[in-house]
């Protein structure tokens, strides 16, 4: 009986120790990324060895569903765990803190900080635009570089002819520039630098990459991975947009 009591206390002690050990959390958000990633099997030709390797080491949610096709409502939903139908946020505005019913909502990083003692970091695109990045917002303890689609072709030159006025957001292609000049490079560089500094644990770091958000510009080496004569294009249903509102064409 004494042994059973000792064993029970030992198991309880071990379980409490395990509960006290809080994991560091690195959350990577990729804007407009679909399932064309190797480990998700969305396209037979895609080459994504780095993210495939990362998925094996971490946690990959393979049955997660986007709450909205727009940035602001979708990101708000993710960070406060409420659907657009309950927040009333369906467009690129408003910032949820400006909605009276939501202004005091506790977000994911704030919950971790308050209840888990986490130090919170953020860089890139986590909320839409500048939301959550002002010093007065107090959404994160440490904030790194913001999101950017730059650089763009000189003089805002359009690389392809597109319907409805050659809008820059539906442009795509390559032009002379370096990967190191891209906003996402700066974001990744900052995040790696923070991790190399061995931050105080536990920590929550959210890293939001802008690409593959439109416009779809990349350096030539990425196009060279997919020669035109070998590329398998996705099947497109003829007239697929005929029964959809024009606004949805840009989603």
Q: Where are the language model's segments positioned?
A:
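Sec-dependent signal peptide recognition
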Residues: 1-9
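Formylglycine-dependent sulfatase
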Residues: 2-3, 18-251
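Hydrophobic h-region of N-terminal signal peptides that target proteins for export
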Residues: 8-18
């Amino acid at each position: 009986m004494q042994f059973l009591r000792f064993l029970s206390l030992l198991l309880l002690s071990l379980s409490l120790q395990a509960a006290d050990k809080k994991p560091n959390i690195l959350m990577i958000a990729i804007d407009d990324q679909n399932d064309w990633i190797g480990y998700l099997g969305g396209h037979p030709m895609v080459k994504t060895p780095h993210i495939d390797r990362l998925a094996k080491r971490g946690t990959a949610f393979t049955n997660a569903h986007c709450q909205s096709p727009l940035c602001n409502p979708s990101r708000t939903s993710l960070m406060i765990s409420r659907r657009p139908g309950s927040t009333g946020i369906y467009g690129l505005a408003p910032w949820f803190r400006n909605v009276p019913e939501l202004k005091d909502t506790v977000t994911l990083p704030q919950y971790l900080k308050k209840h888990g003692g986490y130090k919170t970091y953020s860089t890139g695109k986590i909320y839409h635009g500048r939301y959550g990045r002002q010093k007065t917002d107090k959404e994160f303890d440490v904030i790194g570089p913001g999101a950017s689609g730059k650089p763009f072709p000189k003089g805002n030159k359009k690389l392809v002819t597109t319907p409805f006025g050659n809008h820059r957001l539906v442009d795509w292609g390559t032009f002379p520039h370096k990967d190191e000049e891209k906003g996402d490079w700066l974001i990744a560089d900052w995040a790696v630098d923070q991790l190399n500094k061995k931050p105080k644990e536990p920590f929550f770091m959210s890293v939001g990459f802008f690409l593959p958000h439109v416009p779809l510009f990349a350096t030539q080496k990425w196009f060279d991975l997919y020669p035109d004569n070998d590329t398998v294009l996705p099947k497109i249903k003829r007239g697929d947009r005929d029964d959809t509102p024009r606004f949805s064409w840009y989603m």
